[in-house]
Amino acid sequence: MSLTVRVIAPDRTVWDAPAQEVILPSTTGQLGILPGHAPLLSALDTGVLRVRADKEWLAIAVLGGFAEVENNEVTVLVNAAERGDKIDLEEARAAFSQADERLKGVKEDDRQGKFQATQAYRRARARLQAAGGLVSV
């Protein structure tokens, strides 16, 4: 038994294929989905969605969204997504380093700047993790 997994961004379908397992970056932590999972609707955070298909893991950087699980179908609607195998690792490292420096340089009383820098940092971290260049932070 397997899952049917669809990852859909506003501009394209990122993934649509059978899988044995999915790990979602929910707003409350990592959420593992296996065949036979109970129906579920969950908000997603910025992070890495992982899909196990044909004994291989595929990482997808996602920037928030929602996931629905029902009858062995996992439908993931995301604000933006990028497959890890399509991300240039060196570019992702440079973007992460730049976002980290920007976050460190924001003044403590600059709430809007801090928010924007934090969002950029989280996006860059998710992309780097999906590309395989960062295990954990």
Curated annotation (Swiss-Prot):
Subcellular location: Cellular thylakoid membrane
Lipid bilayer topology: Peripheral membrane protein
GO CC annotation terms, alphabetical: plasma membrane-derived thylakoid membrane; proton-transporting ATP synthase complex
Domain of life (superkingdom): Bacteria
One Gene Ontology MF term: ATP binding
Classification via SUPFAM superfamilies: Epsilon subunit of F1F0-ATP synthase N-terminal domain
Stretches assigned to coiled coil: none
Keywords carried by this UniProt record: ATP synthesis, CF(1), Hydrogen ion transport, Ion transport, Membrane, Thylakoid, Transport
InterPro entries on file: ATP_synth_F1_dsu/esu, ATP_synth_F1_dsu/esu_N, ATP_synth_F1_esu_C, ATPsynth_dsu/esu_N
Assembly, per entry: F-type ATPases have 2 components, CF(1) - the catalytic core - and CF(0) - the membrane proton channel. CF(1) has five subunits: alpha(3), beta(3), gamma(1), delta(1), epsilon(1). CF(0) has three main subunits: a, b and c.
Protein family per UniProt: Belongs to the ATPase epsilon chain family.
Functional description taken from the UniProt entry: Produces ATP from ADP in the presence of a proton gradient across the membrane.
Name of the protein this chain belongs to: ATP synthase epsilon chain
Biological source species: Synechococcus elongatus (strain ATCC 33912 / PCC 7942 / FACHB-805)
